[in-house]
Amino acid sequence: MHVQKKSMTKLDLAVLSSLSESYTLLPFMIFSSLLSGEPDTVNFFVPVLILYSIERACIIGIRGFGEINNPYRILKDGLFMALSGAILMILSYLYRPLLMVSALLVGVGLAPMRAMFIPLFSKMVEKDTSLKKGKTLGLIMYLLMMIFVMVLRNNRLPIIPIFFLLYIAYITFIVLRIDGDEIYENKKAFDSSKRNPVFFLFGVLALLSLLILRQYQMSGVSVLMWLTPLTIVIFFAVELYRRRKYKDYTFQTYWVGGIKCFIMLYSLVFHTSVGNTSMAMMVYLAIAISGIGSDIVRKIMSKKIKGPALSNLCIILSSLFVFLLTLPSKVLNIVGIILSSIFANIVVAEVNVNYMNDKRYVPEERALVKTRLQTAGSIMEQLVLFFTIYIVGEAGIHENLLEPYVAGTPNPEIALILRATGLICSFMLLIVAILIVCVAGKKRNK
């Protein structure tokens, strides 16, 4: 396929940026909206389960192929896979099992999107600094797309799948027009001489953990919970064996992955379980709004607070605002999601700066390292959240708290005990945040 090479415009960059921001949440929303009317619980959950789990596992495992030389090629190949998945999504209206294959292709294809976009974006901005403004426009596009999907989620016509196909097709066209191979001197995607199979192990552990955790979330079979600690033990054992030198922003990355996961997952489980089903899409929308809000708030705060002080303050503020998710008010819950996510996003932005200057990694790989650790943090938080739900449920009412969520039979009577679960997890996040600020901060520049 030959496409005439052209320089990137601000609009092109904005569209690319919108996908780098929404590569996880947007497909998740789309698959959920397509399956919201399915009577069979297994048919409803399996594609969403595959999408999320395989995407997270690929982010962790991709480094096993070798050191990254050419992010452009990885991004391009991933978009072709996602495009194939988008086509199968439409064909699934004719043959439903294709939706599972679609989820697999979209998950694998979009997994490296953000980690590969960041170094490519940096190269583009070096050539034309005016392109930097396209990133803000990308956040606005991201928000508009979320609203579009939310409004049309119950439409019987395949409007959303067609939109997703056109969206991915246009982004693929944009990427093909960029002479990315020239930017990276026609290098191969990976330096195979620097393969590291341990990342394949981490990827498999992540996949198993997520499949088990999400299957527990969606089936309520409590015995599944006891299968996950083994994977976490193996993860820590391998980390100790590798003797990595952790920086303070390494711990910040784990933490921010955890709190962002908690904000979305706890909110969805709580509101669905107690009957606030309309809040599910509002949660997604609030998270999208926080993306724009964090950009504005960071610019204001960075004028007065610099460096580590900014990320430390935002860690504490995000940890405090997350308590609003546990209060008996939908308005305060949404405010909590927005504010906590805003400050968590600022931490992510500050962490990005640190990783982009981290000489331990080649420039093309620094964003992937950050994304990989953030993913690991989200997996750990899911384990903590679901174990807490399981233990509190058994100790409090001697029942599985996820049963109303799984069965689709809301039970407002468990609202109090679910809030107690949220409080416990929020306190743990706050304690970890304080430890990072007070203890891990001493490791900076050591």
Residue ranges and their predicted role:
Residues 80-94, 150, 316-331:
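C-terminal ends and interior cores of transmembrane alpha-helices
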Residues 363-393:
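A late C-terminal transmembrane helix in Major Facilitator Superfamily
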Residues 111-126, 267, 345-361:
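Intracellular juxtamembrane helix-capping segments at the cytosolic ends
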Residues 98-113, 254, 331-348:
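Hydrophobic core of transmembrane alpha-helices in multi-pass small-molecule transporters
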Residues 64-80, 301-316:
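Cytoplasmic membrane-interface "Motif A"-like loop-to-helix N-cap segments
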Residues 54-60, 228-241, 282-304:
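Transmembrane alpha-helices of Major Facilitator/SLC transporters
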Residues 2-56, 209-225, 244-285:
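Helix-loop boundary and gating motifs at the non-cytosolic
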Residues 127-138, 143, 149-263, 430-446:
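Intracellular loop-helix junctions on the cytosolic face of multi-pass helical membrane proteins
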